[in-house]
């Protein structure tokens, strides 16, 4: 059985509830000594506001591809047997499950770590959007994990651009002109010398 055949990824259409037992049964296996799960449910309050329900929308083809990629990364990082990920779309009333992740592994540490990684990455990068519906209004929510991921990616991009500029100047020899670029909290000139320019 290939790694992809050991993943069950479902984006559930409006009106379909998450069947927790189905996904736990899917990941169960004689060689698995642990099954780690995460179940996200709708809570009744947020920052002092009474929540009636959450409503989810998704770009399903891309969400499925993203989840598959996240599962592949988890498999390459931890010793996992099977993974199940299910996410509801449409309204999810208070107390009901909107997302479920189940991971089976030989040992609990791999399953627990992979489960945490999967939910964190789902919230940070999968195109599923949430609207919170309150007694006195509603608002589309942007996950804090998503914002943190965007910031992290921007910082990495800036670091790569800076490094590329420095490497390009070094490669060219830069005709003796002095261009200072910050690099790892040190100031170096374009030739890599630690001389200060005067």
From Swiss-Prot:
InterPro entries referenced in this protein's UniProt entry, alphabetically: MoaE_sf (IPR036563), MOCS2B_euk (IPR028888), Mopterin_biosynth_MoaE (IPR003448)
CDD domains: MoaE
EC identifiers of the protein: 2.8.1.12
Group of enzyme by EC: transferase
Pfam families reported for this sequence: MoaE (PF02391)
Assigned GO CC terms: molybdopterin synthase complex
Pathway the protein acts in: Cofactor biosynthesis; molybdopterin biosynthesis
GO molecular function: molybdopterin synthase activity
Keyword terms, alphabetized: Cytoplasm, Molybdenum cofactor biosynthesis, Transferase
GO biological process entries: Mo-molybdopterin cofactor biosynthetic process
Coiled coil stretches, renumbered: none
Positions with a binding annotation for substrate: 107-108, 123, 130-132
Protein localization: Cytoplasm
Main subcellular location of this protein, as a coarse class: cytoplasm
Catalytic activity: 2 [molybdopterin-synthase sulfur-carrier protein]-C-terminal-Gly-aminoethanethioate + cyclic pyranopterin phosphate + H2O = molybdopterin + 2 [molybdopterin-synthase sulfur-carrier protein]-C-terminal Gly-Gly + 2 H(+)
Self-association state and partner proteins as the record states: Heterotetramer; composed of 2 small (MOCS2A) and 2 large (MOCS2B) subunits.
Role played: Catalytic subunit of the molybdopterin synthase complex, a complex that catalyzes the conversion of precursor Z into molybdopterin. Acts by mediating the incorporation of 2 sulfur atoms from thiocarboxylated MOCS2A into precursor Z to generate a dithiolene group.
PANTHER family: MOLYBDOPTERIN SYNTHASE RELATED (PTHR23404)
Family named by the database record: Belongs to the MoaE family. MOCS2B subfamily.
The protein's name in its UniProt record: Molybdopterin synthase catalytic subunit
């Amino acid at each position: 059985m290939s790694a992809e055949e050991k993943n069950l990824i479902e984006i559930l259409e409006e009106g379909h509830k998450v069947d927790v037992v189905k996904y736990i049964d899917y990941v169960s296996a004689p060689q698995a000594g642990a099954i780690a799960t995460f179940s996200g449910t709708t809570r009744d309050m947020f920052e002092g506001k009474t929540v009636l329900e959450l409503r989810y929308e998704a770009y399903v083809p891309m969400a499925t591809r993203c989840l598959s990629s996240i599962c592949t990364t988890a498999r390459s990082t931890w010793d996992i047997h099977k993974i199940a990920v299910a996410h509801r779309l449409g309204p999810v009333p208070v107390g009901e499950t909107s997302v479920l992740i189940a991971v089976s592994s030989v040992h609990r540490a791999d399953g627990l770590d992979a489960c945490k990684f999967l939910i964190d990455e789902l919230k940070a990068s999968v195109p599923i959007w949430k609207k919170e519906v309150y007694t006195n209004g509603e608002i589309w929510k942007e996950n804090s994990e998503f914002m943190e991921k965007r910031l992290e990616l921007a910082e990495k991009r800036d670091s790569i651009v800076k490094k590329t500029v420095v490497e390009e100047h070094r490669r060219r020899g830069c005709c003796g002109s002095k261009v200072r670029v910050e690099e790892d909290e040190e100031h170096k000139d374009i030739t890599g010398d630690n001389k200060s320019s005067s």
